[in-house]
Amino acid sequence: MAVYTDITEDDLKWFLTEYDVGTLLSYKGIAEGVENSNFLLHTSRDPLILTLYEKRVEKNDLPFFLGLMQHLASRGLSCPLPLPRRDGELLGHLSGRPAALISFLEGMWLRKPEAKHCREVGKALAAMHVAGEGFDIKRPNALSLAGWQGLWEKSEARADEVEPGLQDEIRGELDFLGSHWPKDLPDGVIHADLFPDNVFFLGDELSGLIDFYFACNDQLAYDVSICLNAWCFEKDGAYNITKGMALLEGYQSVRPLSDAEIAALPTLSRGSALRFFLTRLYDWLTTPAGAMVTKKDPLEYLRKLRFHRQIASSAEYGLKA
């Protein structure tokens, strides 16, 4: 979550007249994340999240995102719900941006997740994949193999400013993935961004998943690889096989991976590491100075990518035979 677009109290109060949510008591911007502008609202009834959708989010995709949250919640997944306006619509406009009110989900994200938390994340990810079945709106993954080349071209000329030799390394990685990317794996709705700050816990109990604004249709095991990258590396860059084993066991307790998915994990993990490296690289090079945004280090994901290149078998991630 982040703040790119400022709002005034008067404009916000006018916006809230379109909703049955009580009286505004206070609001503040939320600085975490890099995509939309988000605010925590306290009203006379309930706390709420206000999201203003910035230019990177296509307005045509919003029915998918908001409808998906409704669908998943109806299937028993704990996630925020978009609140309808008095006219029944889920979207309004504020400060020149499409905007929505979202229910507030209790819990906190974990700064230092342990293996037991990774197991719960694996279970929740698999539960989301199962719950997503039957959702009839489709959204291709614009940040998968086909989209990486275009994203790279936006940063390629300045890549060696971040680390010498980066241009040649990433060109080679794109060539490899273009030739070896798995096809015909089970697919469905994926979260595509299930980092620790998008998973809430109350104590050791997972209370819900948030931030579905990268969700799309893709191979389900690709989502697993994203979580391995996001949850199972330590701050020193080392892969924690205990966390990996817990996450994968949790996932397979709900939705067992096929042999083909297991075999593809090293390549999928290279791809998901590259995907987050490329978006972080672009943001690192282009985010305006002074924006209320937390920029993330692209080299963290370059190191993860290099780790996955050395993997000979998915057993090295913690998968039991």
Curated annotation (Swiss-Prot):
GO molecular function, one term: ATP binding
Superkingdom of the source species: Bacteria
Keyword check for Zinc: no
Enzyme class: transferase
Cysteines joined through disulfide linkages: none
Keywords for this protein: Amino-acid biosynthesis, ATP-binding, Kinase, Nucleotide-binding, Threonine biosynthesis, Transferase
EC number: 2.7.1.39
Pathway participation: Amino-acid biosynthesis; L-threonine biosynthesis; L-threonine from L-aspartate: step 4/5
Catalytic reaction equation(s): L-homoserine + ATP = O-phospho-L-homoserine + ADP + H(+)
Biological process (GO), any one: threonine biosynthetic process
Family the UniProt entry places it in: Belongs to the pseudomonas-type ThrB family.
Protein name listed in UniProt: Homoserine kinase
Gene name per UniProt: thrB
